[in-house]
Amino acid sequence: ANKDKPLVWFNRQPSNSSTGELDMAALSFNEDTYYVGFDANQGAELQGTMVKDYIEANIDTIDRNGDGVIGYVLAIGDIGHNDSIARTRGVRKALGTGVEKDGSIDSEPIGTNTDGSASAVQDGSLEVNGKTYTVRELASQEMKNSAGATWDAATAGNAIGTWSSSFGDQIDVVVSNNDGMGMSMFNAWSKDND
């Protein structure tokens, strides 16, 4: 019977697609149930810290328009994937832009937020060299293509083109839930901003 066969979850922990909470029933299906992957929260915390550290180390040049607002855009891979949820929360936590929802930082995409009024995020702040900067998530969206595939690099490349046209030099940092989307955004953005 299937109930006695080994079960291996690989790369994606079974979880609630809305909250990211682990599905313990699936993870403990039988005594031969395993998960092979990494700790999503630890990776997310590291990513958020690295983004924050980069901003602080490059503060003299990162605020491209000198408005005192460090604006970032965020490519979200899959709104129901535990890694995507964790990475979005990790960046928002590190930058102070996260808002609590049901006991965790909200990981929902915000659409656009140029005025800082989105309810899923808030303006954060960083003090560097005696000056306080506002940190604002200008836009975020799930990178899902028309066929329904998520984590889509081409969609991310198109998104940065749209965001760059809309926000111009308000964008100081580009953040992504994975390398493929991040590289696509970098390539499209750098081509448009020689």
Which sequence ranges carry the predicted segments?
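A residue-level marker of the well-folded mature domains of exported/periplasmic proteins
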Residues: A1-D194
